[in-house]
A protein has these predicted regions:
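C-terminal glycine/acidic-rich active-site capping loop/insertion
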Residues: 1-6, 33-111
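Rossmann-like dinucleotide-binding domain that binds NAD(P)(H)
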Residues: 1-24, 28, 115
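Short linear motifs in exposed loops
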Residues: 13, 39-40, 140-141
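Short secondary-structure junction motifs
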Residues: 24, 107, 133-135
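Hydrophobic, well-ordered secondary-structure elements that form the walls
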Residues: 94, 117, 134
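C-terminal/domain-terminus segments
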Residues: 107-115, 141-143
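C-terminal hydrophobic helical "lid"/dimerization subdomain
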Residues: 117-131
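C-terminal capping/lid region of NAD(P)-dependent oxidoreductase domains
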Residues: 129-143
């Protein structure tokens, strides 16, 4: 039990080895009128539970923000944290090959090339064709 300002009581539970938890950092705040829950394993959402009302899901980048909250948002809503880091890793691997004059075949599996781009374009074309033809199966080899 913890006691905060204005005699507010709380409960703090900390564990690095709790059964069924991986690296879950969770904050739950309970009050007389409701509760607020957030988990770092699902960081784009917070759940607001008001007594006698349906739960509300609050999204990162959603409409319930104040102007100061935008300062900590680096990516648009719907993009997961780590999105930018994924691209940064590709650039880092490419720079490593170029700057250190490594054998390009050594890290080639990590880097997308023209063939990867062609496969993606075929997939997009097949998806559009399928959609335009009543969702029929479209083989990528036919594109």
């Amino acid at each position: 039990m913890i006691r905060m300002s204005e005699n507010v009581k709380g409960n703090l539970s900390i564990s690095q080895i709790a059964t069924g938890q991986e690296n879950n950092f969770t904050i739950s705040i309970y009050g007389e009128k409701g509760a607020l829950h957030w988990s770092q394993e699902n960081p784009n959402y917070a759940r607001f539970s008001k007594i006698g009302k349906a739960d509300q899901i609050i999204t990162r980048g959603g409409a319930i923000q104040n102007k100061n909250s935008y300062a900590s948002i680096r990516i648009p809503p719907g993009h997961p944290e780590g999105y930018l880091e994924g691209f940064a890793q590709i650039y880092s691997d490419a720079a490593d090959i170029i700057l250190n004059r490594k054998d390009k075949n050594e890290l080639l599996e990590l880097l997308p090339g023209g063939d990867s781009g062609l496969q993606i374009m075929k997939f997009i074309t097949a998806s559009v064709n399928s959609s335009n033809n009543n969702s029929i199966w479209t083989d990528l080899s036919s594109i």
